Amino acid sequence: GAARRLDRIIMVVLALGIGFFAVDKFVLDPARDAALEEAAEERGRTDAFVQSYGDKSIAVLPFADLSQDGDQGYLSDGVAEEILNLLAQVRELRVISRSSAFRYRGEVHIPTVAEELDVSYVLEGSVRKSGDLVRVTAQLIDARADAHVWSENFDRAIDDIFAIQDDIARRIVDDLKIHLAGSGPRSVRTDPETYQLYLQAWHLLEVEQTSSELAEDLLQQALERDGDYLPALILIVRAVFWHTGNSEDDRYTFDKGIARMRGYVDRALAIAPGNSAALAHRGWMAFWYGNDLETFAEYLNRALQNDPDDEWVLYVAMVNSIRFGRFEDGIAFARARLQRDPLCSGCLYNWMKAAMILGRYDEALAASERRMRVADGGWISRGDIYLLKGDAGKALECYENQAEEPVGFLRSQALAFHEMGDFDARDRAIEALSRIDSDYAFEAMAEVQAWIGNVDSAFEWLGRYLDPDQPNFIQVLSGVLVNPFLRNLHDDPRWRELREQADMTEERLAKIRIEMPP
């Protein structure tokens, strides 16, 4: 039913967003010296990257909504986002991504922001809209000294909003003494009504992360007004994705949803053949809905060549490199995004997991600690590192800090108690876990049974978890294939059959690579 489909969709999206279990305790031993050396090298690489920009680094904070009714947050955030995007096109400038910069909302201590994001300048501002008039106030701050470089009001008609954004970006570039060969980046133009419809949808999807159906309706209205407005064509793909195969609405059957998404991507590529987001969308759709890994890699590599700093493309490259068994590449993509998105919890999560795969447990623990400073939870993952490192007692202490999540906690208890030799406690946890009816619990039961050596039972639970008739079967399976707690299944003929059934053999995956641009 719809609930089970939603369960599966959410699980795959979480995998895309925050990673998946990884590492094989039977193959790799901890390499403490290598881990410490790698961590030192990483600090050196990060410092060198940041220092290469000198003082040319900036964070654009969310602008305040000063409208009379306080209902223009979509516009104030949207203006800040557009200025950020314009500045990000200047290769000589290190610009912190929205996902990190927009965490600092409201009254903030600028020197603290500068230290945590490692930037020299901060842009903050406000937007006040009244009828067809808009006032944008922007102020550039020398973040280290907490001193204003300049502050200015831009009073214009709403029709001139793009010019305001361009003017602010250009002034920042000039003040930071960055020489541009041309006139500098310019906002993608459309009419004011289309732009406001787009910003409302963008705010729902990207800031509030709610109401994708309403967002799609707003984007449809925007495209009816301006069918060539590229940002709307890119964003509506994400809106449609959330409901495809997970709605009673006939528009969102898999066949219809996929066809609509492909149509929007084709229109976007016809307008801008080199648009990185559109290329990446074309690629992941080939993988997600067609198991065409070769086309996926081709389009993602093109996207990275065209814009190696695109944060979403880097994220997709990171997650899927790890899924394809290229763990070092996954870490490299995580590092690349973290250089401009230092608070990216999903990047830190995937880095942690990939480091575990490589047996670099100290590096994994460092990534885990850093992630837990910017996101809630994380105790189960941290416990997994200790478990794989051979410290089941420490692992259990970590697991108990996240006992409110029943499936993950029971699964983790069972693993730890097994390693500690407390088989009665292990069996009680397994019994409780077996009574939970969810896909997540089915996978967890397969993990536990495989870990303790009950291979037949593990395959039975895995069979309940995997549904080859589901259109997202390949994505679910790709997470299973790198799950370390299923390692005991790898020598069983049924494991090879599972890979062959889905055409996800090691031989095929070895030929797929997403390349980090030079």
Task: List the predicted regions and their residue ranges.
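C-terminal accessory segments
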Residues: 446, 450-454, 460, 465, ...
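Solenoid-like repeat scaffolds
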Residues: 304-306, 336-343, 369-376, 400-407, ...
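Acidic, proline/glycine-rich low-complexity intrinsically disordered segments
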Residues: 10, 14-369, 373-374, 379-386, ...
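Terminal, low-structured helical/coil segments at or just beyond the last alpha-helical repeat
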Residues: 480-518
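Boundary/linker segments of alpha-helical solenoid repeat arrays
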Residues: 230-231, 276-277, 310-312, 343-348, ...
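TPR/TPR-like alpha-solenoid helical repeat scaffolds
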Residues: 237-239, 353, 411-423, 475-493
